[in-house]
A protein has these predicted regions:
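Short amphipathic, positively biased membrane-proximal segments
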Residues: 1-164
Length: 164
């Protein structure tokens, strides 16, 4: 019979796998797209170099998994369950953005999705804060990055009206 520590490590691995699965789902749509239509778009001057994105997202995905695991590890409660539902919703919205922006490509729908993503992140932070403060704080860099991504998405649409 597994002990509590083993169960906790398995849960952490599960959150890591769920987060990695969402990341891989999104990556399958963005892989190679940066060389196609995206490369030819007008982009704002503050667009980071392509090499920044994998570093940022790897760090953020680790924080996403860690935060979800911390909330899951808290004592069962309605607040914990509400936070976990929000964790799942942000993960789903996160996975959809790359499909909408790069896969379709439908940057206007991607902008709607990223607004929903940011809203679910903020709601998760508020819910997680009631359950486990470090879990909530772990999401702050993610919220900041997604806010930046929202501005970037909106600016790409503004600079490329043919995409609307």
């Amino acid at each position: 019979m597994p002990n509590a520590r083993t169960g906790s490590l398995l849960a952490l691995a599960g959150f890591g796998l769920a987060t990695a699965g969402a990341a891989l789902y999104g990556a399958r749509y963005s892989r190679g797209k940066r060389d196609g239509w995206y490369r030819d778009l007008r982009k704002p001057s503050f667009t980071p170099p392509d090499k920044v994105f994998p570093v940022a997202w790897t760090t953020l995905h680790a924080l996403i998994a860690y935060s979800g695991w911390r909330v899951w590890s808290a004592a069962p409660s309605r607040q914990r369950n509400a936070a976990l539902r929000l964790w799942i919703s942000q993960l789903a919205a996160n996975a959809q953005w790359s499909k909408l922006f790069f896969g379709k490509p439908r940057p206007t729908l991607a902008l709607v999705d990223v607004f929903a993503l940011e809203g679910s992140i903020i709601a998760y932070i508020a819910a997680a804060h009631k359950v486990d403060r470090p879990a909530a704080y772990a999401f702050v860099p993610y919220a900041a990055w997604v806010a930046f991504a929202t501005v970037l998405n909106a600016e790409i649409l503004r600079l490329n009206p043919q995409l609307s």
